[in-house]
A protein has these predicted regions:
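Bacterial N-terminal signal peptides
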Residues: 8-20
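Bacterial N-terminal signal peptides that target proteins for export
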Residues: 1-9
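Boundary at the C-terminal end of the N-terminal hydrophobic targeting segment
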Residues: 21-25
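Ligand-binding pocket scaffold of soluble enzyme catalytic domains
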Residues: 67, 152, 225
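Short active-site neighborhood of thiol/selenol oxidoreductases, capturing the structured segment around
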Residues: 148-165, 193
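Thioredoxin-like thiol-disulfide oxidoreductase module
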Residues: 135-147, 173-235, 243, 248-253, ...
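Short, solvent-exposed loop/turn and secondary-structure capping segments
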Residues: 59-60, 71-76, 142, 156-157, ...
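Non-globular targeting/processing and membrane-anchoring segments
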Residues: 27-133, 146-147, 247-467
Length: 467
């Protein structure tokens, strides 16, 4: 079907104004009806999603997205060969020579257009390796969950999951968790997925004065909230985990959500309390075993860190997400913000755990396509190997602390006599305020500490009005 010029624009406008996904010819303006003469279903929209005309392509992509997972499946069917080739190229990039600057040919215009369309339909950046559909309307996600009898996995993050510069943990989710074959299958088959932004992701730009800049995010955290098919929260998976541990935690949460979906009142409270109290006991036993393996004496059950009076500092919040801290700690230090140390006991256990952490070939390939390169192939190969070793260690630390400190405290919220928030938004607020140390009342996210002096008027903090 060849349609050009103003007709493309007419079709784009018509689609964007809400024509039915399977519109019949009579639904179209006469000029389109004369040329198309048949229904425009998901298969046709999938072809139009890669149209040369940007307006048409965008309208078709948004219509596919509005069709939900069926729209994603239609796009996959229409472009399976190209998607498979791109997927295989990213996997092959894991072993590509360091002198190849674009080992998966992601800059190729046709491939870039294909992947941009896929990301739009999925609702997630870097969707090629996961092919997951994310709802951004919680009510729609819960309706789908009720219809399919599945739990909801609701991700809360800083920033937008479709943007490169969403918060660091969400970027690690896209690179290390969602592409993992076991994680991907579990999320696709057993959950209805949803994400929402808690607040914009704070960004920092370092201008080196010669045209070079470093642009990244700073501070913030993410969590996956597990809801039953009715939208009631039953658990929270805080921050980043190694892939295998993430699967194990989600499998337990899924079983809980399915088991309690038919319960209410005291029966529901008792079932939730039984589960979460059992998890605390299991964490106690795991901690004893981990301590003995590393030659340490068993220690009292840990609690998540607590700030003193006033709003918490960003440097206190940073160690709550170790992998993220590896990226952000040098930048926090540059702003004059001291970063709290990680307890030695976690460091010693992480040294034992780190070599056992398995990263999928998909993740390693994606990392290779994103890695900064100096141009010296031998140095870049050494740096990449060192980066993977360091990443495994920070993943081990993240997994330990998130499960033994933060998740332990969350389990306690559902124990008998405790008061876990019954609605999702109150639970989100409690996690961010009390555990992630990024309370909504602090617009500066702990980055404006009156107790720190840097020789700048107003501490270098400014407020711009966005009209």
């Amino acid at each position: 079907m060849q349609i050009r010029g103003a007709l493309w624009t007419t079709m784009a406008l018509f689609l964007s104004l809400g024509a039915p996904v399977s519109a019949s010819a009579s639904d179209f303006p006469p000029v389109l009806e004369d040329i198309i003469g048949r229904s425009l279903g998901l298969a046709q929209l999938a072809q139009l999603a890669l149209a040369d005309d940007d307006a048409v392509a965008r309208a078709a992509r948004l219509r596919l997205r509005a069709a939900g997972p069926e729209g994603l499946r239609a796009f996959e069917r229409a472009h399976e060969a190209a998607l498979t080739a791109a997927h295989d190229a990213v996997l092959a990039a894991a072993e590509a020579p360091q002198d190849r600057r674009d080992p998966a040919d992601l800059a190729d215009p046709a491939r870039a257009r294909l992947l941009a369309a896929l990301d739009t339909v999925c609702g997630q950046r870097d969707c090629l390796l996961s092919r997951l559909y994310w709802h951004t309307d919680l009510d729609e996600a819960v309706r789908t969950a009720r219809r399919e009898g599945k739990p909801v996995l609701s991700l809360r993050l800083l920033g937008d999951l479709r943007d490169e510069l969403s918060c660091a943990n969400s970027r690690f989710f896209r690179a290390l968790l969602y592409p993992d074959p076991e994680v991907r299958a579990l999320l696709r088959d057993r959950f209805v997925l949803h994400w929402a932004s808690e607040r914009p992701a704070p960004k920092i730009t370092i201008d080196l004065g010669d045209g070079r800049q470093v642009v990244t995010t700073i501070t913030g955290n993410s969590a996956h909230f597990v809801l039953d098919a009715g939208g009631r929260p039953v658990d929270v998976v805080p921050g980043l985990y190694a892939p295998a541990e993430f699967v194990a935690v989600l499998q337990r949460a899924e079983a809980l959500a399915r088991r309690t979906a038919v319960l209410a009142g005291d029966d529901l409270r008792d079932a939730l309390a039984d589960h979460h109290e059992a998890r605390v006991r299991a964490l106690d036993e795991a901690l004893k075993s981990q301590a003995l393996v590393t030659g340490q004496r068993p220690v009292p059950s840990p609690r998540a860190a607590r700030p003193g009076a006033g709003d918490p500092r960003a440097g206190q919040a940073a160690p709550l997400a170790i992998s993220k801290m590896a990226v952000e700690a040098p930048l926090l230090g540059a702003t004059g913000e001291p970063v709290d140390r990680v307890a030695e006991r976690w460091e010693r256990i992480a040294d034992v755990m780190a070599p056992t952490i398995a990263l999928s070939r998909a993740s390693l390939g994606l990392m290779r396509t994103q890695q900064w390169r100096s141009g010296d192939a031998s140095r870049d190969a050494t740096d990449r190997s060192a980066a993977i070793v360091a990443l495994r260690r920070t993943l081990a630390l993240d997994t330990l602390r998130n499960e033994q400190e933060i998740h332990r405290e969350i389990h306690g919220w559902w124990a008998r006599g405790a008061t876990a928030p019954a609605d999702l938004q109150s639970l989100v607020r409690r996690v961010y305020d009390d555990l992630f140390m990024t309370p909504a009342r602090d617009p500066w996210l702990g980055l404006a500490d009156p107790a720190s002096y840097g020789g700048l008027v107003g501490g270098g903090r400014r407020t711009q009005v966005h009209l």
